[in-house]
Amino acid sequence: MLSRQGIDYDSLVKEDRVHVSLYTDPSIFTDEMEKIFNRGWVYVGHQGEVPRRGDFRLKRIGLQPVIMVRDQDGQVQLLFNRCRHRGATVCQEENGNARSFRCMYHGWTYLLNGELTGVPSIERYGADFKRNELGLLKVPRVSDYRGFIFGSLRPTGTTLDQHLGRARDEIDLFVGLSDADDVEVVSGVHKYSYQGNWKLAAENSMDGYHPSIVHASFAQALIDKITHVPTPEQHRIDRNFAAFRGNTKDFGNGHVMLDYKLRIYDALNGDPSPAVSAVTPRGQANLDELIRRLGPERAANLLREGGTHTFIFPNLILIGIQMRVLQPISADRTEVCLYPTLLKWLTPEVNAIRLRSHEAFFGSASFGGPDDSEIFERVQDGCSAKIEPWQIIGRGLHDERHEDGMIIGDLSDEVTQRGIWRHWKKLMTQGSTASGAGRKRTVSAIALKRGARR
């Protein structure tokens, strides 16, 4: 069998299409875990998930188990969840508060900063046993941007700022209503899994073409709700709802965005009070507090932007008030974790509205999440058909624009999918030395292999 390094990704990723084996081939999945998740920056969690000393939450970087914990000094640590003795995990609870981590196999005990502090019958190891060198291993590089914690398993490489690039502006927008410390991630996590490749969720989250089809009933209900503002200003919203517009953006480094903001602020000629007050009687009070905290100009800009809808390569999606994390499990299985966020300074009433809006689209009994999962599994199943092994991602290719270092297209264009795949191929081909006939696994070779499996 040819080595994974011999896969010819140039033959599998074209400008306007990608080969279905990229969603189905286990060897390609293994290669992704090494070249993308084990080498680059990966989003791990938000500091708001572990607000107190001793708070922890289990995470993964690729397939590797990690504990995110706030240690006894108040620092957030990323520790590998693996005892240094015989390799058992030292923490099984998904989240909680602890003073230490104790391996249930032989009782080795570690402090929250990873230091090995207890070894039963330590004298049997002899005088050369160096307890201070056997703490839990730490993720080599950890960096924080506005409360978003990223880890890299490589000790050297690009900085987090270099990796994020222009996507930092979208993180700024996500927390723009607040300081980083004011973002709370304490409402739990909604998890679901689907039988499909992780990249299906990445592509779909930035797909502006499908909502009017897949989510038609929810979209109509949302439009009815937004445009039904029971005030004398109703006609202004109806008349100006054409302010709804959007586009797709490729920032580079695999970070892409669906910019389909409703622009209600502009539709109301700069006065959002009628719409805000219609949502909740306390809406105007929160609007006044926002202006007081940020000043009129910054508050106006945030209201005008109306939130972000961004994919940060390879596993973080920011949509509205929600952080969504993709966790690959295998070539045909993925777990998705959704974290709704609250703001400390908002009234409980408005924070409750934030949660209800999350549940309406993404909850287990909601419209949106189940719709998307069904599509992912249908696409994965369809990839088993070998008669036509290509997925088309060329929509809008003829008309995309290069502006200010970005690639921009219309809202339903596949600029975002192309941006993800462009960076994916770059990472998968870096350092490749395979060349020549017989050394690279080409489209034809993979097709033959897939046929043989049948």
Model-assigned labels for residue ranges:
Residues 6-22:
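Short, contiguous pre-domain boundary segments
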Residues 70, 75, 140-454:
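C-terminal catalytic domain of Rieske-type non-heme iron oxygenases
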Residues 38-51, 121-125, 304-311:
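Short Pro/Gly-enriched beta-strand edge/turn motifs at strand-loop
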Residues 22, 26-37, 42-62:
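Glycine/alanine-rich phosphate-binding loops at beta-alpha junctions
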Residues 49-169:
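Rieske [2Fe-2S] iron-sulfur-binding domain
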Residues 1-4, 14, 452:
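Non-catalytic, topology-defining segments of multipass membrane proteins
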Residues 2-8, 171-174:
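Short, flexible segments with low predicted structural confidence
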